């Protein structure tokens, strides 16, 4: 049974989970930062998969909110697609495109294995962007695969999706793969 709630406080105290966070566009940035800050402030290291914003932009945004990025490994799947300059970074893996689900999967595996602690998170931003590059059925299969991997890795898994009418059926289907659904 999926726990439903309207606050990220529903995640506090849970050791491992797969959470689907459905966010209004106006709260998207602040919600993402709030979730990450909460995890990092609990001394939980993790992986941030970005399909929306380049690594440098995310780092700058996090620094402005005093989020310690030393505990985060980034996977950036947008900088190359947007034609940005790629410089080798010790805390970031660059992927060619949000369309390349195999590369995203391999990178997540590598990044999670790099974190030596038992307690860790994987933050996937965002399902909505994945749908711009991939068919709905492909995305549903990928999220099913991803939720399974999150359970195998025993992480705190968060999958972000924008609240959009056209994604309603998919969100309902994906709820079955998750432990918690947050309406934010």
Name each model-derived stretch.
Residues 1-61:
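Glycine-rich P-loop/Walker A and Walker A-like loops and their local beta1-loop-alpha1 context
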Residues 6-7, 65-98:
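Nucleotide-state-sensitive switch-loop elements of NTP-binding domains
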Residues 15-17, 42-44, 68-70, 154-155, ...:
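Short glycine-/polar-rich loops that comprise or flank the Walker A/P-loop
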Residues 54-59, 82-83, 166-169:
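Short, charged/polar "capping" segments at the starts of alpha-helices
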Residues 58-67, 169-176:
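Short, aromatic/basic amphipathic alpha-helical patches
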Residues 84-141:
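Phosphate-binding/switch loop-helix module in NTP-utilizing enzymes
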Residues 139-165:
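Substrate-engagement module of ASCE P-loop NTPases
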Residues 155-156, 161-184:
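Phosphate-binding/switch region of NTP-binding enzymes
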